[in-house]
Amino acid sequence: MNLTKKLAFRLLILSLTTTLFVGCNKTRDYKDSSRATGWSLNSKEGGPQKNSKYKEQETGPGLVFVEGGTFTMGRVQDDPMHDWNNSPNQQHVQSFYMDETEVTNYMYLQYLQWIKEVFPPENENYRKIYEGALPDTLVWRNRLGYNEVMTNNYLRHPAYAEYPVVGVSWIQAVEFSNWRTDRVNELILEKEGITARNARYGLKDGETFSTSTYLNAPTQTYGGNDSLTRGGNRSKSIEKRSKDSTNLYIQRKDGLLMPAYRLPTEAEWEYAAIGLVSVRNFNNYRGRKKYPWDGQYTRSGKRKTQGDQLANFKQGDGDYGGIAGWSDDGADITAEIKSYQPNDFGLYDMSGNVAEWVADVYRPIVDDGFNDFNYYRGNVYTKNAIDENGKVKIVTADSIVYDTLSTGKVIARNLPGEILQVPVDENETYLRTQFSTSDNRDYRDGDKASTRFYQSFGEQEDEVVIDPNKRMYNSPNHKVGTLDESEGGGVDREFDKSSSRTSMINNEVRVYKGGSWKDRDYWLDPAQRRYFPQDMATDYIGFRCAMSRVGSKTTQPKRARH
């Protein structure tokens, strides 16, 4: 009997302890009410609204998830070229997405077709838009080589449809990325029943969809055509319930629209290319990697493919692919995408085939002393232009701004339907500690304060006058402009013939990474870096897009960490 009483008493104590423990640690989940005010969420009467169904960012078309982390950026081996432009430094990149492959000819042709249909070059207002987007097919020509077959066929012939596009400048790659963002988000809205079915087809001249315009001034999307902007079944259903509803248009808080496609930063590209996940042991890297694949050699060591090259690159003098019947890499110029095995992130051709543009402005030094998180040089901060009525300014056919590049090529700065962008000014920079100007491309490396000729004596940096011939980087200053119609029109070019120029570095040269079909294996190392003018193109530089990840760092379920 006593034993039974003791057991019952112990069970009672245990249950009370459990109840107290659970009661003290119980917290509200606030799924249906505001953590700030206690108000009900998503009430029909009004109040705060929340997309409670949102889970994680979806992977956009063509992209692969790359979980971010810390890594040693820069060369981790000898520097036989003595460039001294990529000393090792520790960097951290956030998780992001990157194209599985390089952008192909067929992908770029879709862009050209869209421009030609929406902004027909027969219209004088739009003629230069299409011309400015065309790749430079003459990059294949060589004074002592016969390459006319590539000049005439490489971009458009179906035999090369799945080959990486070349002849594209950095500026054109950025414009393609912007176009891709809008087309992906346009399709999302149609699938969600917001915009009219097939609204993206058969548009009139200049009636375009812009993600930025839709988020900031949705009534101006598709040229203000409400039958397209609110023509979906879901929009019609919302409008029937309440014509004054504020939910007629998708907003950023709904989480439906994708972040922008863009060029990857140099840090992102290098991190994704090297793919250190294969040498990770718990929370440490077991060693270093020379290439995107494991090992110190460019040839496969596997039994089935032993001796085959793992990338498309130049084998030696006069050898771009081996001998007939036994090609080492299966290509002499570029190769079709996915011809070689992907790296450990699932990315193809991160070494070889074509080198790739990245977002950064080139400088010999990565300034890790100032920043070691999401490093990027090239920030130019802008804002939406506002008219006298307090509304954003939308670019029209009559207000397109064209830029004449140093090559004489004319490109549109903004397309009709987009919001006009202007540099940030003192309204955004006054007493701000993070930045003080719109253009930060040469910050701490090329600006006035970083040159040895800078002497402030108490003046503000923008008040100090320095001789233009005493710039930190004494690069050529070619001048180009357009002639008036009275002078016959065309382009006025003035080549800088000065013999005192000592550098090619300026704010208009961009980094490109990776080796190509035209390079020796030295350049297959993802740490190697080179630069090229942003408005020029070659037959060995292509590109791929990236996209930032919003939300959690990983797509994997949470697990215990030790």
Task: Set out the residue ranges of the language-model regions.
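Short, P/G- and charge-enriched loop/turn segments at secondary-structure junctions
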Residues: 51-53, 83-86, 499, 529-534
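Bacterial N-terminal signal peptides
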Residues: 11-19
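Bacterial N-terminal signal peptides that target proteins for export
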Residues: 2-11
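Catalytic loop of the DD-peptidase/beta-lactamase superfamily, centered on the K-T-G motif
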Residues: 528-531, 536, 541, 547-548
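A short glycine-rich, aromatic-capped structural motif
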Residues: 55-149, 161-184, 352, 542-543, ...
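Functional-site microenvironments in short loops/helix caps that host divalent-cation chemistry
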Residues: 28-44, 65-66, 72, 77, ...
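C-terminal motif of bacterial Sec signal peptides marking the signal peptidase cleavage site
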Residues: 21-23
